[in-house]
Design a protein with these regions (language model features):
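N-terminal helix initiation/capping motif
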Residues: 1-44, 110-123
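Short conserved beta-strand and strand-loop elements enriched in small hydrophobics
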Residues: 25-28, 58-71
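Short, solvent-exposed secondary-structure boundary/capping segments
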Residues: 48-51, 83-97
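A residue-level detector for short acidic-glycine micro-motifs
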Residues: 30, 41, 78-82, 100
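Short, surface-exposed secondary-structure edge patches
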Residues: 17, 50-54
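Mid-chain, well-packed structural core segment of small domains
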Residues: 69-89
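Residues located in well-ordered beta-strands
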Residues: 38, 75-77, 97
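Hydrophobic core residues within well-ordered beta-strands of beta-rich domains
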Residues: 22, 35, 61, 72-74, ...
Length: 123
């Protein structure tokens, strides 16, 4: 775990929870428009979503992550972006910090990530 931080209005502490490199389908609702995307990594605290034109830091985003048979839904905030001019060999997109899960989304995400980490350690 790292104590890196990114500057921004919320002074979000980057990488507070273990990130799992994981590409899963994601749907984000930004300014009334639904966008289909993919994650690059997921943690209990947030997610990086690859998106060609990420919205500005501070934007509230409704999200849905398709975790096999369970969709995890909720609300998040854009806490940092990686624009095209800074991407080099990394994906363009946005770092979202989870703000609120719907239903038992947090529990489902916790279980899913534990299974993914176990699979990674077993290989």
């Amino acid at each position: 775990m790292s104590s890196d931080s990114r500057e921004g209005p919320s002074r979000f502490k980057f990488r507070e929870s273990t990130r799992t490199p994981l590409e899963v389908p994601a749907t984000v609702l930004i300014a009334g428009g639904e966008i289909q995307a993919k994650t690059a990594n997921v943690s209990l605290g947030g997610v990086f979503i690859s998106l060609p034109k990420p919205p500005p830091v501070g934007t509230m985003v409704k999200f849905a992550l398709d975790l096999n048979e369970k969709a995890v839904r909720g609300f998040s905030e854009v806490v940092w972006i990686r624009p095209a001019q800074e991407s080099l060999d990394r994906p363009v997109g946005m770092g979202l910090q989870f703000r609120h899960f719907l239903d038992d989304g947090e529990g489902a995400l916790r279980l899913f990530l534990a299974e993914q980490l176990q699979n990674l350690e077993g290989t």
